[in-house]
């Protein structure tokens, strides 16, 4: 039986010194040592032009049903400066969960590191 939506407001944040040690390690190597359990779909491509080649920060994870961005709206206000928002939407590539207005809010107001 499904338990419905859950939003965890308390986050266990990683130690900044430990995070910074990952700055020069390729993501593929990190994925390998985590049992190949933390990689993105290879169809996902970079669409921005980041200032730095590699970035490190805590992840705020969002699990949403395809086409349902309610959980993502909650994440907009939970995200902290420097966070990366990672969204799983049941691999639905037919509908977008966010657009330009939400992206601008995250970038300029919340100052997240990436999505």
Named regions from a protein language model:
Residues 42-45, 63-64, 86-88, 114-115:
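General beta-strand structural signal in soluble alpha/beta enzymes
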Residues 50-103:
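A glycine-rich, hydrophobic loop/mini-helix early in the fold
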Residues 32, 104-105:
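Surface-exposed charge patches
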Residues 93, 105-115:
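Ligand/cofactor pocket segment of small-molecule handling proteins
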Residues 1-63:
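Intrinsically disordered, low-complexity regions enriched in acidic/Ser/Thr/Pro/Gln residues
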Residues 22, 84, 105-108:
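Phenylalanine-focused residue identity feature
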